[in-house]
Amino acid sequence: MLGIWTGLAVLALGGVIFLASRVWSLRGQRGTVLAAPDRTKTFNGPALTVGTYNIHRARGTDGRRDLRRIARVISGCDIVALQEVEGPRPGSGHNQAWHLGRWLRLAAHFAPSRKLFFFPHRGNALLCRFPVSYWQRLALFPSTGRAHRNLTVYQVDLAGSPVHILNTHLSKPAEGASPFEAVMSAFGQYPRAILLGDFNAPMDHPAMRRWLPPDTVDALADAGFDPMRVDMILIRGLSVDEAWSSPIGPSDHPFFAVRLRLQ
C-alpha cells in the first residue's frame, strides 16, 4: 500500500514539475498606478522625449549581461518602452524594469507576457516621468511556442490632456497576422497616441500597412534609418521635432528615440 501511495506522490510531483516548467501565457490585466509613482512630475512642455528599446534581457552583442549599459543608453528620456524584459531573478525579487526605474528616477511598469515556474518570466515594460492614470495589458493571440505576446496601453496625463502610450512586441507576420490587427485597432481608438515596440516586420510589410490608421506618422521615417528596421515609433495627434538612435552593443537591437510636441 505504501508503494502505491509513493508512486502516486511521485507522479503528482512529476506533473507539477512538468506544468511549472512550461511557458504559459498571462491573461489581461488592468490597473491605475505604476511602481514608484512618487518619481513622476507634471509635464510642463512644450516637448517630450520618447524612446523604444528591445533590450534583449540586457545581454549585449558581446554576450555580457549588463543592465547598467541599458540605463546609460536610455537616460534622459521621459518615456521609454522596453521589450524582452526579464522578470524577477532568483534571489532578487525585482524585474529589470524596476531596477532601471530606480536608477533613472522614473516610474516603472513590467507587463509580463508569459510565466515560467508559476512566476512572471519575460515581457515588456514602460518607464515614465509623467503621471499614468490607467493601464491595461491585453494578451495577443495566436501565440506560437514560447513566444507569447501582449499589448499594454497606458494613459499618460500631459498638460491636462490624455496621451495614450501603447507598447508591444510582435512575432513575425508569418506566424499570425491577428496580433497586428489587434494592435492597430487599439492604436486607432485614441486621437493622440504613441505606438512603440518591436514589430518583427518593416513599415512596408502588408501586415503593417493593412490595418495602420490612415493618419499615422512614422516618427522615424525622415531620420535616414534602415527602411527594414522592425523597431517602431508611430504617432497620431503629435508632431516630430527630431529623431535619433544608438547602435547595437548593449543589446542586439538599436535604441530609437524622438522628441515629440503636442498638437
Briefly describe each language-model feature range.
Residues 1-75, 79, 91, 102-103, ...:
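Active-site regions of metal-assisted phosphoester/phosphodiester hydrolases
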Residues 81-86:
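A short beta-strand-loop structural module common to alpha/beta enzyme folds
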Residues 89-95:
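Short, flexible/disordered intra-domain loops and linkers
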Residues 98:
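Active-site-proximal alpha/beta segments of enzymes that process anionic O-linked groups
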